Structures are given as C-alpha cells and as structure tokens.
From Swiss-Prot:
Changing A60C: NBD-linked protein fluoresces at acidic pH in presence of liposomes, suggests this residue faces lipids. It comes from Mycobacterium tuberculosis (strain ATCC 25618 / H37Rv). Changing T37C: NBD-linked protein does not fluoresce at acidic pH in presence of liposomes, this residue may face inwards in membranes away from lipids. This is 6 kDa early secretory antigenic target. One of its GO terms (molecular function) is host cell surface binding. The lineage of its organism: Bacteria, Bacillati, Actinomycetota, Actinomycetes, Mycobacteriales. Changing A14R: Wild-type virulence in an esxA deletion strain.
C-alpha cells in the first residue's frame, strides 16, 4: 500500500501565490485602465461611448476573474487546513 503524504506548507504556499497573483493582476489592470482613461478623455461622440461600453464589459470580466481566483485561493487554503486537521486527528488516534 502506498503511503499518503500531504505537504501542508506547500498547499498554503500555493494559495498565497494565487492571492499574490490576484493582487498583481488587479494592479496591472488598474494601471492599464488609467492609461486608457487618459486616452479616452480625448475622444468624443460615439467613439467615446463605444469605448465606455467595452470598458465596462472588460471591468466586469476582470472583476469576475479576480473573484474566481480569490475564491480558488481561499478554497485551497481551507482544504489544506481541513486536511491538516484530519491528519492531526488520525495521528492522535494512534498516539
């Protein structure tokens, strides 16, 4: 029978890395939006309106992506904690 081993520190590191990526993505998206906002300020008429519509869709999709990544990071972390707790309980049964 193969022995099952968990790397709890590795699981938590993965969750933290995903959360760090969420922060980086958010910063990059904000930076890009600020640059585009400066450019869009020079536009007028229907071109500006069309841009605003696309920007709103982009913002909604970016928010959805970041929320999904945050949920993934939280779920991985919670699963790691639950597995560590279970491991501790099982170990305690044999101590």
């Amino acid at each position: 029978m193969t022995e099952q081993q968990w790397n709890f520190a590795g699981i938590e590191a993965a969750a933290s890395a995903i959360q760090g990526n969420v922060t980086s993505i958010h910063s990059l998206l904000d930076e890009g939006k600020q640059s585009l906002t400066k450019l869009a300020a020079a536009w007028g008429g229907s071109g500006s309106e069309a841009y605003q519509g696309v920007q709103q869709k982009w913002d909604a999709t970016a928010t959805e992506l970041n929320n999904a990544l945050q949920n993934l990071a939280r779920t991985i972390s919670e699963a790691g904690q639950a597995m560590a707790s279970t491991e501790g309980n099982v170990t305690g049964m044999f101590a």
